[in-house]
Swiss-Prot record:
PANTHER family per record: ATP SYNTHASE SUBUNIT ALPHA, MITOCHONDRIAL
UniProt-listed PROSITE patterns: ATPASE_ALPHA_BETA (PS00152)
Compartments it resides in: Plastid, Chloroplast thylakoid membrane
Name of the protein: ATP synthase subunit alpha, chloroplastic
Site features described as Required for activity, chain residue numbers: 363
Annotated function: Produces ATP from ADP in the presence of a proton gradient across the membrane. The alpha chain is a regulatory subunit.
GO molecular function, one term: ATP binding
Length: 507
Protein backbone atom coordinates (compact mmCIF):
# COMPACT_ATOMS: atom_id res chain seq x y z
CA UNK A 1 0.00 0.00 0.00
CA UNK A 2 1.30 3.48 -0.96
CA UNK A 3 2.15 5.67 2.01
CA UNK A 4 0.78 9.19 1.90
CA UNK A 5 3.46 11.77 2.70
CA UNK A 6 1.78 14.85 4.08
CA UNK A 7 4.81 17.14 3.62
CA UNK A 8 4.97 16.38 -0.14
CA UNK A 9 1.26 17.10 -0.58
CA UNK A 10 1.50 20.36 1.37
CA UNK A 11 4.51 21.43 -0.78
CA UNK A 12 2.56 20.78 -4.00
CA UNK A 13 -0.45 22.73 -2.67
CA UNK A 14 1.83 25.61 -1.61
CA UNK A 15 3.45 25.71 -5.10
CA UNK A 16 0.06 25.73 -6.78
CA UNK A 17 -1.14 28.59 -4.56
CA UNK A 18 2.00 30.60 -5.35
CA UNK A 19 1.55 30.00 -9.10
CA UNK A 20 -2.08 31.06 -9.05
CA UNK A 21 -2.47 34.33 -10.89
CA UNK A 22 -5.78 36.06 -10.49
CA UNK A 23 -6.21 37.81 -13.83
CA UNK A 24 -9.56 39.29 -14.74
CA UNK A 25 -10.09 39.85 -18.48
CA UNK A 26 -12.93 42.09 -19.55
CA UNK A 27 -14.12 41.16 -23.04
CA UNK A 28 -16.57 43.35 -24.90
CA UNK A 29 -18.97 40.85 -26.49
CA UNK A 30 -22.21 40.83 -28.43
CA UNK A 31 -24.68 38.48 -30.11
CA UNK A 32 -25.50 38.13 -33.80
CA UNK A 33 -29.07 39.29 -34.48
CA UNK A 34 -29.05 38.95 -38.24
CA UNK A 35 -26.50 38.11 -40.97
CA UNK A 36 -26.59 38.17 -44.76
CA UNK A 37 -25.27 39.98 -47.88
CA UNK A 38 -21.90 40.54 -46.19
CA UNK A 39 -23.52 42.50 -43.32
CA UNK A 40 -24.14 41.41 -39.71
CA UNK A 41 -26.27 43.16 -37.08
CA UNK A 42 -24.91 42.67 -33.57
CA UNK A 43 -26.64 43.26 -30.23
CA UNK A 44 -24.25 44.27 -27.45
CA UNK A 45 -20.63 45.35 -28.16
CA UNK A 46 -21.44 48.42 -26.04
CA UNK A 47 -17.94 49.92 -26.06
CA UNK A 48 -16.97 49.20 -29.67
CA UNK A 49 -15.21 51.97 -31.63
CA UNK A 50 -16.16 53.07 -35.15
CA UNK A 51 -13.93 51.15 -37.56
CA UNK A 52 -12.87 48.61 -34.90
CA UNK A 53 -12.26 45.00 -35.91
CA UNK A 54 -14.61 42.43 -34.37
CA UNK A 55 -14.16 38.66 -34.35
CA UNK A 56 -16.98 36.16 -34.80
CA UNK A 57 -17.14 32.80 -33.03
CA UNK A 58 -16.13 30.88 -36.16
CA UNK A 59 -13.13 33.12 -36.95
CA UNK A 60 -14.51 35.62 -39.50
CA UNK A 61 -13.32 39.21 -38.97
CA UNK A 62 -15.58 42.22 -39.54
CA UNK A 63 -15.42 46.01 -39.23
CA UNK A 64 -17.93 47.91 -37.07
CA UNK A 65 -19.16 50.73 -39.33
CA UNK A 66 -22.64 51.60 -38.02
CA UNK A 67 -22.96 52.32 -34.29
CA UNK A 68 -26.70 52.56 -33.63
CA UNK A 69 -28.67 52.88 -30.38
CA UNK A 70 -29.73 49.24 -30.19
CA UNK A 71 -27.33 47.39 -32.50
CA UNK A 72 -24.01 47.58 -34.34
CA UNK A 73 -23.77 47.20 -38.14
CA UNK A 74 -20.70 45.16 -39.09
CA UNK A 75 -19.34 44.55 -42.61
CA UNK A 76 -17.71 41.13 -43.05
CA UNK A 77 -14.24 40.50 -44.47
CA UNK A 78 -15.25 37.12 -45.80
CA UNK A 79 -18.33 35.24 -46.96
CA UNK A 80 -19.53 34.62 -43.37
CA UNK A 81 -21.43 31.48 -44.39
CA UNK A 82 -20.74 29.78 -41.04
CA UNK A 83 -21.96 32.68 -38.89
CA UNK A 84 -25.24 31.80 -37.16
CA UNK A 85 -27.89 33.90 -35.50
CA UNK A 86 -27.26 33.98 -31.75
CA UNK A 87 -23.52 33.22 -32.01
CA UNK A 88 -21.16 35.45 -30.03
CA UNK A 89 -18.92 38.24 -31.32
CA UNK A 90 -16.07 39.91 -29.47
CA UNK A 91 -14.41 43.28 -30.00
CA UNK A 92 -10.65 43.07 -30.60
CA UNK A 93 -9.71 46.61 -29.54
CA UNK A 94 -7.76 46.99 -32.82
CA UNK A 95 -8.32 49.00 -36.00
CA UNK A 96 -7.54 47.43 -39.41
CA UNK A 97 -3.78 47.30 -40.00
CA UNK A 98 -1.44 45.40 -42.32
CA UNK A 99 2.15 44.15 -42.10
CA UNK A 100 4.63 46.09 -44.30
CA UNK A 101 8.20 45.40 -45.42
CA UNK A 102 10.60 45.39 -48.39
CA UNK A 103 9.72 41.70 -48.87
CA UNK A 104 6.40 42.73 -50.47
CA UNK A 105 8.20 43.85 -53.66
CA UNK A 106 7.47 41.49 -56.54
CA UNK A 107 4.46 39.92 -54.80
CA UNK A 108 0.70 39.81 -55.44
CA UNK A 109 -1.37 40.30 -52.27
CA UNK A 110 -5.02 40.81 -51.30
CA UNK A 111 -6.60 43.71 -49.38
CA UNK A 112 -5.38 42.24 -46.07
CA UNK A 113 -1.80 42.09 -47.46
CA UNK A 114 -1.92 38.27 -47.51
CA UNK A 115 -0.04 36.72 -50.48
CA UNK A 116 -2.24 35.24 -53.23
CA UNK A 117 0.51 34.33 -55.71
CA UNK A 118 1.28 30.90 -54.22
CA UNK A 119 4.87 31.84 -53.33
CA UNK A 120 4.65 31.44 -49.56
CA UNK A 121 4.37 33.83 -46.63
CA UNK A 122 5.86 37.34 -46.61
CA UNK A 123 8.05 38.23 -43.64
CA UNK A 124 7.30 41.60 -42.02
CA UNK A 125 8.34 43.16 -38.74
CA UNK A 126 6.27 46.34 -38.87
CA UNK A 127 2.57 47.19 -39.09
CA UNK A 128 0.81 50.22 -40.59
CA UNK A 129 -2.81 51.28 -40.18
CA UNK A 130 -4.79 50.77 -43.38
CA UNK A 131 -6.39 54.19 -42.84
CA UNK A 132 -3.78 56.68 -41.68
CA UNK A 133 -3.87 60.47 -41.76
CA UNK A 134 -2.54 62.28 -44.84
CA UNK A 135 0.59 64.47 -44.42
CA UNK A 136 -0.26 68.01 -43.28
CA UNK A 137 0.62 71.28 -45.01
CA UNK A 138 3.95 71.69 -43.17
CA UNK A 139 4.96 68.11 -44.02
CA UNK A 140 4.72 68.77 -47.77
CA UNK A 141 6.59 70.72 -50.40
CA UNK A 142 5.48 71.67 -53.91
CA UNK A 143 5.95 69.18 -56.73
CA UNK A 144 9.08 69.90 -58.77
CA UNK A 145 10.55 66.60 -60.05
CA UNK A 146 9.14 64.94 -63.17
CA UNK A 147 7.73 61.41 -63.11
CA UNK A 148 8.24 60.23 -66.68
CA UNK A 149 5.49 58.03 -68.12
CA UNK A 150 7.33 57.23 -71.35
CA UNK A 151 4.34 58.51 -73.37
CA UNK A 152 5.12 61.57 -75.51
CA UNK A 153 1.60 63.03 -75.30
CA UNK A 154 1.68 63.01 -71.48
CA UNK A 155 5.30 63.94 -70.75
CA UNK A 156 5.26 66.87 -73.19
CA UNK A 157 1.78 68.36 -72.74
CA UNK A 158 0.25 66.95 -69.52
CA UNK A 159 3.39 66.43 -67.38
CA UNK A 160 3.15 64.49 -64.12
CA UNK A 161 5.41 65.32 -61.16
CA UNK A 162 6.48 63.17 -58.22
CA UNK A 163 3.86 63.67 -55.51
CA UNK A 164 1.09 64.69 -57.92
CA UNK A 165 -2.35 63.07 -58.30
CA UNK A 166 -3.36 62.76 -61.94
CA UNK A 167 -6.67 61.16 -62.87
CA UNK A 168 -6.88 58.82 -65.89
CA UNK A 169 -10.47 58.95 -67.09
CA UNK A 170 -12.32 57.44 -70.05
CA UNK A 171 -14.86 54.90 -71.23
CA UNK A 172 -14.26 51.18 -70.93
CA UNK A 173 -11.77 49.71 -73.41
CA UNK A 174 -10.01 53.00 -74.21
CA UNK A 175 -6.57 52.00 -72.90
CA UNK A 176 -6.66 53.41 -69.33
CA UNK A 177 -4.87 50.43 -67.78
CA UNK A 178 -2.37 50.45 -70.68
CA UNK A 179 -1.35 54.05 -69.84
CA UNK A 180 -0.89 53.04 -66.20
CA UNK A 181 1.13 49.86 -66.93
CA UNK A 182 3.33 51.71 -69.46
CA UNK A 183 4.10 54.22 -66.70
CA UNK A 184 5.15 51.35 -64.39
CA UNK A 185 7.38 49.87 -67.14
CA UNK A 186 9.01 53.27 -67.64
CA UNK A 187 10.09 53.45 -63.96
CA UNK A 188 12.71 50.75 -64.57
CA UNK A 189 16.05 52.01 -63.27
CA UNK A 190 14.44 55.21 -61.89
CA UNK A 191 14.42 53.97 -58.26
CA UNK A 192 10.61 54.29 -58.02
CA UNK A 193 8.54 51.69 -56.14
CA UNK A 194 5.23 50.97 -57.93
CA UNK A 195 1.99 49.71 -56.37
CA UNK A 196 -0.79 48.55 -58.71
CA UNK A 197 -4.19 48.18 -57.00
CA UNK A 198 -6.80 46.20 -58.95
CA UNK A 199 -10.32 46.77 -57.59
CA UNK A 200 -13.19 44.64 -58.86
CA UNK A 201 -11.33 43.69 -62.05
CA UNK A 202 -11.64 40.36 -63.85
CA UNK A 203 -9.04 37.91 -62.52
CA UNK A 204 -7.89 37.32 -66.13
CA UNK A 205 -7.19 41.08 -66.60
CA UNK A 206 -5.12 41.20 -63.40
CA UNK A 207 -3.20 38.07 -64.47
CA UNK A 208 -2.49 39.73 -67.83
CA UNK A 209 -1.06 42.86 -66.14
CA UNK A 210 1.09 40.74 -63.79
CA UNK A 211 2.39 38.67 -66.75
CA UNK A 212 3.31 41.84 -68.70
CA UNK A 213 5.17 43.24 -65.67
CA UNK A 214 7.00 39.93 -65.10
CA UNK A 215 8.04 39.58 -68.74
CA UNK A 216 9.49 43.10 -68.76
CA UNK A 217 11.29 42.69 -65.41
CA UNK A 218 9.07 45.31 -63.75
CA UNK A 219 7.73 43.08 -60.95
CA UNK A 220 10.96 43.42 -58.97
CA UNK A 221 10.03 47.01 -58.02
CA UNK A 222 6.22 46.53 -58.06
CA UNK A 223 3.60 45.30 -55.57
CA UNK A 224 0.20 44.21 -56.91
CA UNK A 225 -2.81 44.47 -54.56
CA UNK A 226 -5.73 42.60 -56.12
CA UNK A 227 -9.35 42.17 -55.11
CA UNK A 228 -11.17 40.74 -58.11
CA UNK A 229 -14.85 41.03 -59.05
CA UNK A 230 -15.82 37.99 -56.95
CA UNK A 231 -14.32 39.43 -53.73
CA UNK A 232 -16.62 40.67 -50.93
CA UNK A 233 -17.52 44.38 -51.21
CA UNK A 234 -15.68 45.08 -47.92
CA UNK A 235 -12.37 43.91 -49.37
CA UNK A 236 -12.88 45.82 -52.63
CA UNK A 237 -13.52 48.93 -50.51
CA UNK A 238 -10.36 48.35 -48.44
CA UNK A 239 -7.95 47.45 -51.28
CA UNK A 240 -6.97 51.06 -52.25
CA UNK A 241 -6.23 51.95 -48.61
CA UNK A 242 -4.04 48.84 -48.30
CA UNK A 243 -2.13 49.89 -51.42
CA UNK A 244 -1.71 53.41 -50.00
CA UNK A 245 -0.39 51.99 -46.68
CA UNK A 246 2.22 49.90 -48.56
CA UNK A 247 3.28 52.93 -50.65
CA UNK A 248 3.46 55.14 -47.52
CA UNK A 249 5.86 52.67 -45.89
CA UNK A 250 8.37 53.39 -48.69
CA UNK A 251 7.51 57.11 -48.94
CA UNK A 252 8.41 57.72 -45.28
CA UNK A 253 11.68 55.87 -45.90
CA UNK A 254 12.78 58.61 -48.33
CA UNK A 255 11.81 56.63 -51.44
CA UNK A 256 9.72 57.64 -54.46
CA UNK A 257 6.54 55.64 -55.04
CA UNK A 258 3.87 55.47 -57.73
CA UNK A 259 0.43 54.05 -56.95
CA UNK A 260 -2.26 53.18 -59.47
CA UNK A 261 -5.88 52.63 -58.40
CA UNK A 262 -7.64 50.62 -61.11
CA UNK A 263 -10.36 51.73 -60.75
CA UNK A 264 -12.07 53.96 -58.19
CA UNK A 265 -15.53 53.63 -59.84
CA UNK A 266 -15.57 50.00 -58.69
CA UNK A 267 -14.52 51.00 -55.17
CA UNK A 268 -17.35 53.56 -55.03
CA UNK A 269 -19.81 50.88 -56.18
CA UNK A 270 -18.59 48.47 -53.48
CA UNK A 271 -18.95 51.23 -50.87
CA UNK A 272 -22.45 52.07 -52.17
CA UNK A 273 -23.43 48.40 -51.82
CA UNK A 274 -22.16 48.28 -48.22
CA UNK A 275 -23.84 51.58 -47.31
CA UNK A 276 -27.22 50.63 -48.75
CA UNK A 277 -27.15 47.26 -46.97
CA UNK A 278 -26.29 49.09 -43.73
CA UNK A 279 -29.41 51.21 -44.44
CA UNK A 280 -27.53 54.50 -44.65
CA UNK A 281 -29.56 57.15 -46.52
CA UNK A 282 -28.77 57.22 -50.27
CA UNK A 283 -27.90 60.44 -52.09
CA UNK A 284 -27.18 61.27 -55.74
CA UNK A 285 -27.02 58.13 -57.97
CA UNK A 286 -27.80 56.17 -54.74
CA UNK A 287 -24.25 56.79 -53.44
CA UNK A 288 -24.00 57.62 -49.72
CA UNK A 289 -23.37 61.18 -48.60
CA UNK A 290 -19.72 60.55 -47.68
CA UNK A 291 -18.58 59.09 -51.03
CA UNK A 292 -16.55 62.27 -51.67
CA UNK A 293 -14.70 61.73 -48.39
CA UNK A 294 -14.13 58.09 -49.40
CA UNK A 295 -11.91 59.25 -52.27
CA UNK A 296 -10.54 62.51 -50.84
CA UNK A 297 -9.03 60.85 -47.75
CA UNK A 298 -7.42 58.25 -50.03
CA UNK A 299 -5.97 60.64 -52.62
CA UNK A 300 -4.79 63.21 -50.06
CA UNK A 301 -2.31 60.58 -48.84
CA UNK A 302 -0.32 61.13 -52.06
CA UNK A 303 2.26 63.83 -51.40
CA UNK A 304 5.75 65.17 -51.96
CA UNK A 305 7.27 65.25 -48.46
CA UNK A 306 9.32 68.17 -47.15
CA UNK A 307 13.12 67.98 -46.83
CA UNK A 308 12.84 67.48 -43.04
CA UNK A 309 10.90 64.25 -43.71
CA UNK A 310 13.34 63.02 -46.34
CA UNK A 311 11.71 64.26 -49.57
CA UNK A 312 10.02 60.93 -50.32
CA UNK A 313 6.99 61.04 -52.59
CA UNK A 314 3.83 59.17 -53.48
CA UNK A 315 2.38 59.86 -56.92
CA UNK A 316 -1.20 58.64 -57.43
CA UNK A 317 -2.77 57.77 -60.77
CA UNK A 318 -6.41 56.98 -59.99
CA UNK A 319 -8.46 55.55 -62.86
CA UNK A 320 -12.18 56.30 -63.26
CA UNK A 321 -14.47 54.76 -65.86
CA UNK A 322 -17.08 56.94 -67.56
CA UNK A 323 -20.30 55.88 -69.29
CA UNK A 324 -20.31 57.05 -72.94
CA UNK A 325 -17.91 59.92 -72.23
CA UNK A 326 -20.01 61.54 -69.49
CA UNK A 327 -17.40 63.36 -67.40
CA UNK A 328 -20.12 65.21 -65.46
CA UNK A 329 -21.40 62.11 -63.61
CA UNK A 330 -21.07 62.03 -59.81
CA UNK A 331 -17.88 60.00 -59.24
CA UNK A 332 -15.91 61.51 -62.19
CA UNK A 333 -16.65 65.10 -61.05
CA UNK A 334 -15.73 64.22 -57.46
CA UNK A 335 -12.37 62.73 -58.41
CA UNK A 336 -11.62 65.50 -60.95
CA UNK A 337 -12.09 68.07 -58.16
CA UNK A 338 -9.75 66.16 -55.81
CA UNK A 339 -6.90 65.48 -58.25
CA UNK A 340 -4.27 67.82 -59.74
CA UNK A 341 -5.43 67.29 -63.32
CA UNK A 342 -6.81 64.60 -65.59
CA UNK A 343 -5.84 62.63 -68.67
CA UNK A 344 -8.97 62.09 -70.75
CA UNK A 345 -9.01 59.06 -73.04
CA UNK A 346 -11.52 59.28 -75.86
CA UNK A 347 -13.30 56.27 -77.40
CA UNK A 348 -13.58 58.12 -80.75
CA UNK A 349 -9.82 58.71 -80.92
CA UNK A 350 -9.17 55.12 -79.87
CA UNK A 351 -11.46 53.78 -82.60
CA UNK A 352 -9.86 56.02 -85.23
CA UNK A 353 -6.47 54.44 -84.49
CA UNK A 354 -4.91 57.17 -82.33
CA UNK A 355 -3.34 55.28 -79.44
CA UNK A 356 -2.78 56.24 -76.67
CA UNK A 357 -6.20 57.88 -77.25
CA UNK A 358 -5.43 61.01 -75.22
CA UNK A 359 -7.70 63.99 -75.89
CA UNK A 360 -5.12 66.75 -75.43
CA UNK A 361 -7.80 69.46 -75.60
CA UNK A 362 -9.56 68.63 -72.32
CA UNK A 363 -6.69 66.88 -70.54
CA UNK A 364 -4.77 69.09 -68.12
CA UNK A 365 -2.03 68.94 -65.50
CA UNK A 366 -2.35 71.54 -62.75
CA UNK A 367 1.33 71.16 -61.85
CA UNK A 368 2.33 72.01 -65.41
CA UNK A 369 5.88 72.73 -66.53
CA UNK A 370 7.17 72.59 -62.92
CA UNK A 371 7.18 68.84 -63.53
CA UNK A 372 9.34 68.97 -66.68
CA UNK A 373 13.06 69.14 -67.26
CA UNK A 374 14.27 72.31 -69.01
CA UNK A 375 15.01 70.48 -72.27
CA UNK A 376 11.42 69.24 -72.50
CA UNK A 377 10.04 72.73 -71.76
CA UNK A 378 12.17 74.10 -74.61
CA UNK A 379 10.67 71.82 -77.26
CA UNK A 380 7.18 71.01 -75.92
CA UNK A 381 5.65 74.51 -75.78
CA UNK A 382 5.49 74.75 -79.56
CA UNK A 383 3.92 71.27 -79.86
CA UNK A 384 0.90 72.07 -77.68
CA UNK A 385 0.23 75.35 -79.50
CA UNK A 386 0.49 73.80 -82.98
CA UNK A 387 -1.79 70.89 -82.05
CA UNK A 388 -4.41 73.27 -80.60
CA UNK A 389 -4.35 75.38 -83.79
CA UNK A 390 -4.56 72.21 -85.90
CA UNK A 391 -7.63 70.94 -84.02
CA UNK A 392 -9.37 74.28 -84.62
CA UNK A 393 -8.40 74.36 -88.30
CA UNK A 394 -9.42 70.75 -88.88
CA UNK A 395 -12.95 71.46 -87.65
CA UNK A 396 -13.13 74.54 -89.91
CA UNK A 397 -11.61 72.74 -92.94
CA UNK A 398 -14.48 70.24 -93.01
CA UNK A 399 -16.80 73.02 -94.20
CA UNK A 400 -14.38 74.98 -96.42
CA UNK A 401 -13.73 73.70 -99.95
CA UNK A 402 -10.75 75.76 -101.15
CA UNK A 403 -8.01 76.46 -98.59
CA UNK A 404 -4.98 78.67 -99.11
CA UNK A 405 -1.48 77.19 -99.18
CA UNK A 406 -0.56 78.28 -95.64
CA UNK A 407 -3.66 76.59 -94.20
CA UNK A 408 -2.98 73.41 -96.18
CA UNK A 409 0.61 73.37 -94.86
CA UNK A 410 -0.61 73.86 -91.30
CA UNK A 411 -3.09 70.99 -91.67
CA UNK A 412 -0.38 68.75 -93.13
CA UNK A 413 1.97 69.61 -90.24
CA UNK A 414 -0.80 68.89 -87.71
CA UNK A 415 -1.48 65.45 -89.18
CA UNK A 416 2.21 64.56 -88.87
CA UNK A 417 2.38 65.86 -85.30
CA UNK A 418 -0.63 63.73 -84.40
CA UNK A 419 1.15 60.78 -85.99
CA UNK A 420 4.29 61.26 -83.87
CA UNK A 421 2.18 61.09 -80.68
CA UNK A 422 1.10 57.53 -81.54
CA UNK A 423 2.90 54.81 -79.60
CA UNK A 424 2.66 51.03 -79.34
CA UNK A 425 1.60 49.55 -76.01
CA UNK A 426 4.43 48.58 -73.61
CA UNK A 427 6.96 50.64 -75.60
CA UNK A 428 7.71 53.70 -73.43
CA UNK A 429 10.30 56.19 -74.70
CA UNK A 430 13.13 57.85 -72.78
CA UNK A 431 13.10 61.66 -72.36
CA UNK A 432 15.93 62.00 -74.90
CA UNK A 433 13.94 60.01 -77.49
CA UNK A 434 10.85 62.13 -76.81
CA UNK A 435 12.74 65.41 -77.20
CA UNK A 436 14.24 64.20 -80.47
CA UNK A 437 10.80 63.10 -81.77
CA UNK A 438 9.05 66.38 -80.86
CA UNK A 439 11.86 68.55 -82.28
CA UNK A 440 11.76 66.64 -85.58
CA UNK A 441 8.00 67.22 -85.89
CA UNK A 442 7.69 70.84 -84.76
CA UNK A 443 10.60 72.02 -86.94
CA UNK A 444 9.03 70.73 -90.15
CA UNK A 445 11.43 67.87 -90.89
CA UNK A 446 8.51 65.45 -91.31
CA UNK A 447 6.57 67.69 -93.72
CA UNK A 448 8.21 66.17 -96.79
CA UNK A 449 7.20 62.62 -95.78
CA UNK A 450 3.87 60.89 -96.36
CA UNK A 451 1.78 60.55 -93.15
CA UNK A 452 2.14 56.76 -93.35
CA UNK A 453 5.96 57.00 -93.38
CA UNK A 454 6.28 59.16 -90.25
CA UNK A 455 6.39 56.40 -87.61
CA UNK A 456 8.79 54.23 -89.61
CA UNK A 457 11.14 57.19 -90.11
CA UNK A 458 11.05 58.13 -86.40
CA UNK A 459 11.83 54.56 -85.27
CA UNK A 460 14.84 54.45 -87.61
CA UNK A 461 15.94 57.95 -86.54
CA UNK A 462 15.92 56.94 -82.84
CA UNK A 463 18.12 53.92 -83.59
CA UNK A 464 20.44 55.97 -85.83
CA UNK A 465 20.83 58.74 -83.23
CA UNK A 466 21.57 56.23 -80.46
CA UNK A 467 24.28 54.43 -82.46
CA UNK A 468 25.98 57.32 -84.30
CA UNK A 469 25.45 60.30 -81.95
CA UNK A 470 25.53 58.96 -78.34
CA UNK A 471 26.75 62.41 -77.18
CA UNK A 472 23.21 63.79 -77.73
CA UNK A 473 21.81 61.52 -75.01
CA UNK A 474 24.76 62.31 -72.69
CA UNK A 475 24.29 66.09 -73.04
CA UNK A 476 20.56 65.96 -72.22
CA UNK A 477 20.85 63.46 -69.34
CA UNK A 478 23.73 65.40 -67.72
CA UNK A 479 22.67 69.04 -68.29
CA UNK A 480 18.84 68.48 -68.52
CA UNK A 481 18.98 71.25 -71.17
CA UNK A 482 18.55 71.25 -74.94
CA UNK A 483 21.85 73.03 -75.66
CA UNK A 484 23.02 74.44 -79.00
CA UNK A 485 25.48 71.55 -79.24
CA UNK A 486 22.67 69.01 -78.75
CA UNK A 487 20.56 70.81 -81.37
CA UNK A 488 23.44 70.76 -83.88
CA UNK A 489 23.97 67.02 -83.32
CA UNK A 490 20.25 66.36 -83.73
CA UNK A 491 19.94 68.44 -86.93
CA UNK A 492 22.91 66.57 -88.40
CA UNK A 493 21.42 63.17 -87.50
CA UNK A 494 17.98 64.10 -88.93
CA UNK A 495 19.52 65.26 -92.22
CA UNK A 496 21.70 62.15 -92.57
CA UNK A 497 18.82 59.80 -91.70
CA UNK A 498 16.44 61.65 -94.06
CA UNK A 499 18.85 61.14 -96.98
CA UNK A 500 19.22 57.44 -96.12
CA UNK A 501 15.45 57.03 -95.69
CA UNK A 502 14.61 58.65 -99.07
CA UNK A 503 17.17 56.41 -100.81
CA UNK A 504 15.66 53.33 -99.12
CA UNK A 505 12.13 54.30 -100.13
CA UNK A 506 13.17 54.93 -103.74
CA UNK A 507 14.93 51.56 -103.88
Amino acid sequence: MVTIRADEISNIIRERIEQYNREVKIVNTGTVLQVGDGIARIHGLDEVMAGELVEFEEGTIGIALNLESNNVGVVLMGDGLLIQEGSSVKATGRIAQIPVSEAYLGRVVNALAKPIDGRGEISASEFRLIESAAPGIISRRSVYEPLQTGLIAIDSMIPIGRGQRELIIGDRQTGKTAVATDTILNQQGQNVICVYVAIGQKASSVAQVVTTLQERGAMEYTIVVAETADSPATLQYLAPYTGAALAEYFMYRERHTLIIYDDLSKQAQAYRQMSLLLRRPPGREAYPGDVFYLHSRLLERAAKLSSSLGEGSMTALPIVETQSGDVSAYIPTNVISITDGQIFLSADLFNSGIRPAINVGISVSRVGSAAQIKAMKQVAGKLKLELAQFAELEAFAQFASDLDKATQNQLARGQRLRELLKQSQSAPLTVEEQIMTIYTGTNGYLDSLEVGQVRKFLVELRTYLKTTKPQFQEIISSTKTFTEEAEALLKEAIQEQMDRFILQEQA
